[in-house]
A protein has these predicted regions:
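Non-catalytic regulatory/accessory regions that flank a structured catalytic core
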Residues: 3-11
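Conserved beta-strand hairpin/beta-sheet module of binuclear metal-dependent hydrolase folds
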Residues: 31-99
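Metallo-beta-lactamase
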Residues: 25-27, 35-39, 130-142
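Active-site metal-binding motif and surrounding structural segment of the metallo-beta-lactamase
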Residues: 87-136
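Short linear motifs in intrinsically disordered
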Residues: 22-25, 60-61
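Surface-exposed, flexible loop/turn segments at secondary-structure boundaries
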Residues: 49, 118, 141
């Protein structure tokens, strides 16, 4: 799935606790930025300046990204996280997600297209933090 994102400078999701365009960095150089898509919809883009396979395979510029989309929970409904990153981004992704969601006891739906060993580590961490997590996978055997 390809998503074209445009940042809206005056947009602030009503219930997300976020700083517009906030960035979290680590010693490894990975960071996560927040890009609002629409009311209640936020892209969490994990960035890495290091050389990765995408640069070689797809002739992209140096570095790679891991894009996730978070849909705000409506009253009485679960928040929806689509395509969380792999374990390499967990140290920058999980703190931002925790800040945005606030209450770890709220239901959380996680949607993935496939599950691989890299993603399983982050999914395990999510399940430990959010006991009401429900995983939806369209191709769990891939």
């Amino acid at each position: 799935m390809t998503v074209v994102l445009q940042a809206f400078p005056d947009f602030m999701p009503p219930r997300f606790k976020t700083d517009q365009g906030s960035v979290v960095s680590t010693a490894a150089g990975r960071r996560t930025i927040q890009l609002p898509i629409d009311t209640g919809v936020l892209c969490l883009r994990g960035l890495s300046p290091e050389r990765h396979r995408f640069e070689l395979e797809y002739a992209l510029e140096r570095g790679s990204t891991a894009n996730s989309v978070l849909f705000e929970a409506a009253d009485g409904a679960a928040a929806v996280l689509v395509h969380p990153p792999g374990a390499a981004y967990s140290s920058v992704f999980l703190p931002q997600l925790n800040t945005l969601l606030g209450d770890a006891e709220q239901p959380l739906l996680v949607v993935v297209g496939h599950v691989n060993p890299n993603r399983i580590a982050l999914l395990r961490s999510l399940a430990e933090i959010y006991p009401k997590l429900e995983l939806i996978a369209s191709n769990p055997g891939a």
